[in-house]
């Protein structure tokens, strides 16, 4: 991979804060931190457009005693076999379960699947976390 050197102008105070943070995190140099920021910026933009393939997790907490939530969750998971790769089910207590659903597909479709899962009656909380599949990252 060819590297290109470029310069930027930013306020000194902003650079000082940035340097403190990247040192705390453990970056060896600014270039690595800037590369990660640019990658993250590109990935988030691709999610907004919705046409790029992403990977991620949909994590939900639900009360398995409430209505038909278990059946509806399973039905939805079977409806999206191409996008849902795997699931992890954890019993939190006598009534509450945590489910981590690993997904891969077009960003727009993954967001729609997450919305459908999180809006089911009985789901107490849900969160979608998306990342790149790594294919297009440099």
Swiss-Prot record:
One GO BP: response to nickel cation
Binding site for Ni(2+): 78, 89, 91, 97
Keywords assigned by UniProt, alphabetized: DNA-binding, Metal-binding, Nickel, Transcription, Transcription regulation
Cofactor, how bound (note): Binds 1 nickel ion per subunit.
Cofactor(s) demanded: Ni(2+)
Gene3D superfamilies given in the database record: ACT-like. Chain A, domain 2, Met repressor-like
InterPro entries: Acetolactate_synth/TF_NikR_C, ACT-like_dom_sf, Arc_rbn_hlx_hlx, CopG, CopG/NikR_regulator, Ni_resp_reg_NikR, Ribbon_hlx_hlx, TF_NikR_Ni-bd_C
CDD domains per the UniProt record, alphabetical: RHH_NikR_HicB-like
GO molecular function: DNA binding; DNA-binding transcription factor activity; nickel cation binding
Family: Belongs to the transcriptional regulatory CopG/NikR family.
Function statement: Transcriptional regulator.
Name of the featured protein: Putative nickel-responsive regulator
Organism annotation: Pyrococcus abyssi (strain GE5 / Orsay)
């Amino acid at each position: 991979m060819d590297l290109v050197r470029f310069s930027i102008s930013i306020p000194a105070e902003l650079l000082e804060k940035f340097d403190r943070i990247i040192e705390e995190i453990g970056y060896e140099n600014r270039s690595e931190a800037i590369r990660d920021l640019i990658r993250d910026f590109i990935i988030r933009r691709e999610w907004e457009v919705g046409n790029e393939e992403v990977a991620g997790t949909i994590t939900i907490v639900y009360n398995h005693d409430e209505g038909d939530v278990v059946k509806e969750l399973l039905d939805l998971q079977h409806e999206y076999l191409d996008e849902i790769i795997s699931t992890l089910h954890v019993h939190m207590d006598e009534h509450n379960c945590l489910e981590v659903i690993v997904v891969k597909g077009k960003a727009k479709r993954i967001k729609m699947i997450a919305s459908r899962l999180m809006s089911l009656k009985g789901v107490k909380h849900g969160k979608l976390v998306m990342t790149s599949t790594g294919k297009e990252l440099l």
